[in-house]
Amino acid sequence: MSDETTSSPSPAPAKKKQNLGWMEWMRGWSSVFGEILFQRITASHLENPLPLPSVNDLTCVVTGSTSGIGRETARQLAEAGAHVVMAVRNTKAAQELILQWQNEWSGKGLPLNIEAMEIDLLSLDSVARFAEAFNARLGPLHVLINNAGMFAMGEAQKFSEEGYEQHMQVNHLAPALLSVLLLPSLIRGSPSRIINVNSVMHSVGFVDPDDMNVVSGRRKYSSLIGYSSSKLAQIMFSSILFKKLPLETGVSVVCLSPGVVLTNVARDLSRILQALYAVIPYFIFSPQEGCRSSLFSATDPQIPEYWETLKNDDWPVCPFISQDCRPANPSEEAHNTETAQRVWKKTLELVGLPLDAVEKLIEGENIQCRYGAQHE
């Protein structure tokens, strides 16, 4: 009888997921069209404009606030008494808006406490410099609203000056870098909030952490893939940040859908789709309607309680607020915690931050970033 033992064959390695499955894809598009067709019905209980609680002591940073949802968000927060920092690429346009708003507000109360600071989300160096300048004030930040976004529908693939696909940088990488770098100010402002204006389009998104620029050839690039992937990446990164921030910091992280809104993002649509936007106003929110979920997430007193409940329940994704200002559940792929962890690590690598950046900032330590004045 032979003494040799027969070894069992090693299991074949699991096949790497290349894209959404058909059922996931169909459920995703069902969510998209459901929001388009029924958002007015589901949000019919909301007032327009949305009444806000007292925000007199809040300092709020709103990116992309010279047009669309961001413009309405900044204006309404300022009129409600908040100190608003318009974080924008075009500071001249922001200053003109501030002057206009001050004139319109004249005689209604104290002058609006609003200012403009320059930031360009297509430049990570600009993002880091903005954070450095804001943190240098040594004041509190109570609400960061990552509102700026882009959807260059139909355009060929383009890259930022750092070499990253433009949707991924503007919609995910730059807001992620800004959120982490502003943690010192957010902790000073505790209880505080990071609000990410996301989209129901994340439901049809898929992220390959090894190919976030969609250049490997495994997937054919389209602007739709670029946009939806960036929005899913933002939720995944936010979900890990949600887990890493202890309750003691008092910093909440929320993603939201504003609904389908007639904004300057529509300027990037094809002429046919722009025409459709014009003829179906019943289905499309105005910017004033679209900003309600942003304002709700930024100011409602129940948000920190909801955030704490999800943390205590070890919920796998960060809080997500729908266009009707109710809690919602992101897509099935957004719950993929393994991919989310890889997206977290890859994002920090791409934006030039150490893997322990959040932990160090919570402890009050300094960190090194590949971008900004400190790297000169």
Curated annotation (Swiss-Prot):
The modification N-acetylserine is found at residue 2. It is an enzyme of class 1 (oxidoreductase). Keywords: Acetylation, NAD, NADP, Oxidoreductase. GO terms for molecular function: oxidoreductase activity. The keyword Protease does not apply. It comes from the Eukaryota. NAD(+) binds at residues 61-85. Its EC number is 1.1.-.-. Expressed in roots, stems, leaves and flowers and, at lower levels, in siliques. SUPFAM superfamilies: NAD(P)-binding Rossmann-fold domains. One of its GO terms (biological process) is meristem maintenance. Substrate binds at residue 199. Coiled coil: none annotated. Pfam families: adh_short. One of its GO terms (cellular component) is endoplasmic reticulum. Putative oxidoreductase. Required for vegetative shoot apex development, especially during leaf positioning and for shoot apical meristem (SAM) maintenance. Belongs to the short-chain dehydrogenases/reductases (SDR) family. PANTHER family: DEHYDROGENASE_REDUCTASE SDR FAMILY MEMBER FEY (PTHR24320:SF200), RETINOL DEHYDROGENASE (PTHR24320). This is Dehydrogenase/reductase SDR family member FEY. The gene is FEY.
